[in-house]
A protein has these predicted regions:
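Active-site phosphate/pyrophosphate-binding segments
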Residues: 228
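Residue-identity detector for threonine
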Residues: 6, 29, 42, 66-67, ...
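Structural motif
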Residues: 29-33, 62-63, 86-88, 117-118, ...
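Nucleotide/pyrophosphate-binding catalytic subdomain
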Residues: 1-212, 382-383, 402, 409-419
């Protein structure tokens, strides 16, 4: 089980989460619960760091940010003990979450779950602080980046061979669009890992991308449910769905995109690889990439790509350091970009989806600035102020509303028992 920040935002919600954990235990389940920091606590810690330092040291940021989850776990353990059950709270390090040394964006290398198993064997409920681990090299505290508690939960589930990893959030499951933008969006009962990966990469905030990748790679079924109501939620699994999938499953969006353009880049073999290697070394994820035709002299071109908005300053610094070596004209950035995507396994076997997408956006007066496609996804970069209108128009055009007919019960689908 994993409870997100809104599910443990205050004392009352921590009590409610603890009561749900206890119910699962009383139903005969051996329970490990991964907990996030309370509400906006992590954001408050980040703001505090920047109040005292213009450029906080990444190692010290990890020391600071890892405290939030520890507070939640300790409080939840107190509640569970008061409810008559024995609980033990563990930091990421104590739980055996071993990572690389990438401070603020560390990756899990392995989970040494001996201490978790020992707690379970003693009949205890084990509470694990999400979002954190310990460096294999330096033994320093590390954090996993935004949404890292999802990854912690899936990694622990995989290490324990758990039947399912239940992710509890403030929404009832995964929807065909953000209900705050599209009120008629419908809940999706089941998704393949392939679909969920594309949705997470395109802005769907219910599950963090790395957690879905980890679940797919280790065969862990994920069950997304609401902390505040009982219901079937959404199951994400690796089994092929035997019924025909709808053409488009969902419309996702992101308003945290930035575009960076390198002007006057010499058009020679290997230079794009050099640029992208520098960004990878800075731990910056590059999404869409386009390079125009060389200019009239045949030797210079412009190269544009998108990165997370929070990484613009670091990306510019890395690229400007390359300028003397590569000899390009300059670095330009625009951080007021957004991305709109349509996702659906049914797109594999249906032509014309891209044409319909571009026509719908064109009729709505939304200019497409960059395009990326995969067999089950089409993504368009647009101005940030056009994102919500684009989402609504595409959701309507592909008939994804509450009255849409989607397969509710699919042969071969494993549906975890509701606790």
């Amino acid at each position: 089980m994993k409870f997100g920040g809104t599910s443990v935002a205050d004392a009352e919600r921590i009590k409610r989460a603890a009561e749900r954990i206890v119910r699962a235990k009383e139903a005969g389940t051996r329970v490990v619960a991964v907990l996030s920091a309370r509400g906006k606590h992590t954001d408050e810690l980040v703001s505090l760091a920047y109040e005292v330092s213009d450029r906080p040291d990444p190692r010290e940021m990890d020391m600071l940010l890892s405290t939030g989850e520890r507070v939640t776990c300790a409080l939840a353990a107190m509640v569970i003990n008061d409810l008559g059950h024995e609980a033990i709270s563990l930091t990421g390090s104590q739980a055996g979450i071993v990572t690389d040394s990438g401070h603020t964006k560390a990756r899990i290398i392995e989970v040494k779950a001996d201490r978790i198993r020992s707690g379970l064997d003693d009949g205890k409920i084990v509470l694990v602080a999400g979002f954190q681990g310990v460096s294999q090299e330096s033994y320093d505290v590390t954090t996993l980046g935004r949404g890292g508690s999802d990854t912690t939960a899936v990694a622990v589930a995989a290490a324990l061979g758990a039947d399912v990893c239940e992710i509890y959030t403030d929404v009832a499951g995964v929807f065909s669009a953000d209900p705050r933008i599209v009120p008629e969006a419908r809940k999706l009962p089941v998704l393949t890992f392939e679909e969920m990966l594309e949705m997470s990469a395109s802005g769907a905030g219910v599950l963090q991308l790395r957690s879905v990748e980890y679940a797919r790679n280790h065969g862990v079924t994920i069950h997304c449910r609401s902390s505040f109501e009982d219901g079937p939620g959404t199951v994400v699994q690796d089994e092929e769905l035997t019924m025909e999938r709808p053409l488009v499953t969902a419309v996702t969006h992101s308003t945290s995109e930035a575009r960076i353009t390198l002007t006057g880049l010499p058009d020679v073999p290997g230079i794009a690889g050099r640029v992208l290697t520098a960004l990878a070394d800075a731990n910056i994820n590059v999404d869409m990439i386009i390079q125009n035709e060389p200019q009239s002299d045949g030797h210079l071109a412009d190269m544009s790509f998108t990165v997370p908005r929070d990484d613009v300053a670091t990306a510019r610094e890395s690229l400007e350091a390359l300028q003397p070596e590569l000899g390009f004209g300059g670095v330009q950035s625009d951080d007021r970009m957004g991305k709109v995507s349509i996702v659906g396994a049914g797109m594999k076997s249906h032509p014309g989806v891209a044409a319909k997408t571009f026509t719908v956006l064109g009729d709505a007066g939304v200019n497409i600035e960059m395009i990326s496609t995969s067999p089950i996804k089409i993504s368009c970069v647009v101005r940030e102020e056009h994102v919500e209108e684009a989402v609504r128009k595409l959701h309507t055009a592909f008939e994804l509303g509450a009255d849409a007919v989607l397969p509710e019960d699919v042969a071969g689908v494993h549906r975890p028992k509701v606790a």
